[in-house]
């Protein structure tokens, strides 16, 4: 942009151009002046905005921590000290300041750098993070290990290095964070917890803890008075020399007055704050002081999510995680098409009108799961529990016991946190709870921590559970409607995708444990196909979102003169084995395709059923037992040998 060129020339002429591209490690910014730091922050924001505008990613959270990142890197020695970013979707400035500027244009792309911290990328990335509330426990473990190992080294007087856990106020609502807080308070090690308070997790925070932090923010009077006492004492050396105990006791008395009910103080922490999270100098002064303490510390900073980009400041929830967008006005690029999340959102509003017993629960993701619409229509029947998936599930069990019909909407990758609660608190008592697993299967661009490929293997073994997988918008609505009237717990898994093309057969009524057969002759083909036998010799068994690739494969096989039918399972659990065998008999080749891991998945189970029935030539395609990296959906499927071409090759 022309304005940016003039801006950079203006800065360069005044010696203020810091040249972000030349920064290779945090030590490079240690001697920057105040003006150079302000320029650096501006350059970082411009780079983040331009890259996320092109690639998509987490924008608002990253724009909010630019000054905080700079202050941390200037206050700590990165050769020995560890900075751990909770969730780590706010690590973009961290990456730009640790030698990854040249790779930053490939952020979240196939083969590019991750949108989260990743140990394989840099020694400055201490953990592979992606889920919330882990940093305090990880940081405490790292600090404890360093301390114990240093104690075993003879004649070693060097410090093992500081550990800093940066956690947001939203992530601090997670139970794991509180477990870590309690343990760190007990051990009394100098773990430094930086509480990044922007009043948001993804959407605006709700609940008691959010209100509690707001009250702490009001205690800024204490910090102002304390700083005034320090400044006064420093100006008159005799006071510090002869009355140090009096000053200390006076400040402790003030602390008791203003922070009498401060949870962190009660847990055994030194509490400092709240600080302006966009004032580098103020944060540096505090960070350099607290790292000298011999006890755990909470440094409370207030930041603004989306800072520096007006559209993100105005709507931080929209720009939390966003696809490619226009930098000029913040509008999302590309046509807006109906997604499975949209279908769920609309259907829940309709069902909520029909049945007053329906209640909805989410874990800090009302907009992402589509439940924001339900919350607006029926606020008294909507519960956002914060980042607390375990509580969400057990809470739902209690609601079901009380006679309501709870619908719990959680991403597939996050439901992993609550498997014990699903088993013990819902499936065991056979409570009627409906779990809507959004982002199931291959999830583009977010990488290993966000793939939804484990839910089938994790849940198929749980008694009493019914698991459904829709292949179209109509099937999703049909399954959700049916789930309301079912008994016991029900899981419906669906992808982060635009809805598949509707076929007439998808409108068939649900029949427990049975799917629907799609004949090769019913598939539309744009190309002239070779003549095929009237009887199909290949059967492609699939479920859910993989109907797209499987249909493409069947059409390609048809063009080669191979007639391939498709069996859409619909039910992942239970499976009517007798009916399934009757469908499969007569086919020479059977290919089973799923968007979950093969080990423990639906494919292995069906293969066992068919082999027991003496059927042969069966192939199972699914994700390998490994963590799947980032890329578009097509790239992820190709890497896992699950593309339409791979399915076609298996069917030949």
What are the residue ranges of the model-derived segments?
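N-terminal amphipathic, basic-rich helices that act as targeting or association modules
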Residues: 15-98, 263-284, 293, 297-303
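Generic long, charged, amphipathic alpha-helical segments
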Residues: 384-385, 551-583
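Non-catalytic terminal/interface segments that mediate subunit docking, oligomerization
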Residues: 82, 303-415, 421-431, 488, ...
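Glycine-/acidic-rich phosphate or pyrophosphate-binding loops and their flanking alpha/beta elements
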Residues: 145, 285-288, 320-321, 339-354, ...
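Cofactor-binding active-site loop characterized by glycine-rich and histidine/acidic residues
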Residues: 58-187, 357-358, 362-363, 371-372
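Structural signature of the thiamine diphosphate
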Residues: 243-311, 432-437, 456-505, 644-652
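Long, well-ordered, tryptophan-enriched scaffold segments
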Residues: 20, 199-344
């Amino acid at each position: 942009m022309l304005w940016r060129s003039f801006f950079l020339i203006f800065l360069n002429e005044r010696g203020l151009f810091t040249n972000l591209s030349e920064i290779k490690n945090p030590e490079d910014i240690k001697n920057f002046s105040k003006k150079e730091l302000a320029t650096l922050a501006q350059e970082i924001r411009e780079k983040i905005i331009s890259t996320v505008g092109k690639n998509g990613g987490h924008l608002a959270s990253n724009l909010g921590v630019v000054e905080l990142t700079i202050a941390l890197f200037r206050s700590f020695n990165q050769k020995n000290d560890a900075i751990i970013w909770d969730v780590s979707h706010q690590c973009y400035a961290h990456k730009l300041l640790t030698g990854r500027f040249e790779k930053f244009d490939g952020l979240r792309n196939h083969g590019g750098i991750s949108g989260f911290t990743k140990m394989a990328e840099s020694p400055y990335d201490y953990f592979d993070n992606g889920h919330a509330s882990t940093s305090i426990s990880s940081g405490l473990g790292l600090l404890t290990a360093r301390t114990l190992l240093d104690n075993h080294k003879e004649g070693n007087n060097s410090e093992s290095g500081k550990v800093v856990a940066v956690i947001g106020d939203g992530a601090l609502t997670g139970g794991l964070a509180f477990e870590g807080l309690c343990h760190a308070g007990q051990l009394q090690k100098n773990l430094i917890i930086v509480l990044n308070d922007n009043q948001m997790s993804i959407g605006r925070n709700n609940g008691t803890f959010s209100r509690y932090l707001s009250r702490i923010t009001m205690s800024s009077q204490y910090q102002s008075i304390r700083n005034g006492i320090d400044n006064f004492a420093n100006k008159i050396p005799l006071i510090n020399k002869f009355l140090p105990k009096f000053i200390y006791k006076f400040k402790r008395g003030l602390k008791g007055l203003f922070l009498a009910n401060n949870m962190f103080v009660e847990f055994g922490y030194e509490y400092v704050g709240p600080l302006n999270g966009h004032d580098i100098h103020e944060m540096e002064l505090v960070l350099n002081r607290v790292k000298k303490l011999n006890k755990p510390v909470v440094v409370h900073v207030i930041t603004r999510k989306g800072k520096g980009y007006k559209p993100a400041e105005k709507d931080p929830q929209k720009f939390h995680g966003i696809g490619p967008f226009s930098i000029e006005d913040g509008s999302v690029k590309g046509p807006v098409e109906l997604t499975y999340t949209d279908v769920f959102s609309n259907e829940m509003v309709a069902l909520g009108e029909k049945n007053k017993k329906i209640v909805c629960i989410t874990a800090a993701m009302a907009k992402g799961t589509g439940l924001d619409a339900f919350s607006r229509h029926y606020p008294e029947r909507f519960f956002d529990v914060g980042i607390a998936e375990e509580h969400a599930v057990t809470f739902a069990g209690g609601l079901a016991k009380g006679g309501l019909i709870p619908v719990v909407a959680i991403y597939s990758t996050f439901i992993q946190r609550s498997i014990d609660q699903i088993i013990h608190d819902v499936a065991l008592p056979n409570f009627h709870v409906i779990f809507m697993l959004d982002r199931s299967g291959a999830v583009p661009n977010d990488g290993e921590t966000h793939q939804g490929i484990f839910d089938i293997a994790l849940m198929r073994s749980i008694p009493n559970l019914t698991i459904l997988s829709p292949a179209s918008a109509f099937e999703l609505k049909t399954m959700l409607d049916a789930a309301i009237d079912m008994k016991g717990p029900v899981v419906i898994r669906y992808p982060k995708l635009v809805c598949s093309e509707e076929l007439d057969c998808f409108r068939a009524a649900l029949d427990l444990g049975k799917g629907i057969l799609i004949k090769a002759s019913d598939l539309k083909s744009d190309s002239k196909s070779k003549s095929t036998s009237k009887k199909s010799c290949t059967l492609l068994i699939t479920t859910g979102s993989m109907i797209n690739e499987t249909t493409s494969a069947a059409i390609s096989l048809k063009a080669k003169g191979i007639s391939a039918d498709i069996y859409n399972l619909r039910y992942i659990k239970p499976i009517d084995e007798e009916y399934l065998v009757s469908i499969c008999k007569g086919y020479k080749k059977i290919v089973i395709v799923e968007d979950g891991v093969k080990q423990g998945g639906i494919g292995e189970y069906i293969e066992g059923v068919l082999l027991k029935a003496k059927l042969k030539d069966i192939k199972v395609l699914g994700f390998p037992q490994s963590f799947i990296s980032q890329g578009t959906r097509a790239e992820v499927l190709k890497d896992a040998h699950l593309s339409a071409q791979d399915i076609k090759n298996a069917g030949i």
